[in-house]
Design a protein with these regions (language model features):
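Glycine- and other small-residue-rich loops at beta-strand/loop junctions that grip anionic moieties
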Residues: 18-19, 84, 155
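Phosphate-binding site of ATP-dependent enzymes
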Residues: 23-24, 31-38, 42-137, 141
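Conserved N-proximal alpha/beta basic substrate-recognition cap immediately N-terminal to
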Residues: 1-20, 24-28
Length: 177
């Protein structure tokens, strides 16, 4: 539920995304998108397993899907495939929301030679003041969070687009004043 929840918000607020384990569906989605995509395991955390795929690497997609989806015991895993948001290489913003209202934010910047901005993946943290666009995003999603009983969450935002809602373990409390 954690990583799937953000799909409940309108597409205007988030990048185009699919959650699937069907190779054909994933290939079609990948072909229909721009030049870059983000692939992440549905059950991952802390940036583990999150990779940036460029369209020119399409010939390697079968190998990636074998690794991410197919288990040796014959079972399969779901993956999230998300349209790349320009500017993601500059990091993301983690916003903590309590009772539908933002209580603080931090900018997470990727480490050297990495696209992931998670602190556990080598990213660093900077102070951040919410932009007008980020405040508006919080205003739009806050009521639904409360309605769904999600009183304390961390959302990840890139260029005003919602990329993830962390409902189980919204890290970042210690970094926010």
């Amino acid at each position: 539920v954690n990583k799937m929840y953000f799909q409940h918000f309108p597409e205007i607020l988030r990048p185009e995304t699919i959650i699937s384990r069907d190779e054909k569906e994933i290939r079609e989605f990948f072909k229909s998108q721009k030049q870059k995509m983000i692939l992440k395991p549905l059950n991952g955390y802390g940036g583990s397993g999150v990779i940036l795929i460029e369209k020119r690497a399409m010939s390697s997609i079968r190998s990636l899907l074998d690794f991410y989806i197919d288990n040796k015991d014959g079972t399969t895993n779901y993956v999230i495939l998300q349209d790349y948001i320009p500017g993601a290489d500059q990091g993301d913003v983690r916003i903590l929301i309590l009772n539908g209202k933002p209580i603080g934010a931090m900018k997470r910047v990727p480490g050297d030679d990495d696209h992931r901005s998670n602190v556990s993946a080598g990213g660093s943290v900077q102070r951040h003041t919410l932009s007008k666009q980020e405040k508006e995003l919080c205003r739009r999603i806050g009521p639904k969070l409360v309605k769904d009983g999600l009183y304390f969450v961390g959302i990840d935002v890139i260029n005003g687009m919602l990329v993830e809602v962390n409902v189980m373990s919204p890290g970042g409390v210690t970094y926010i004043n």
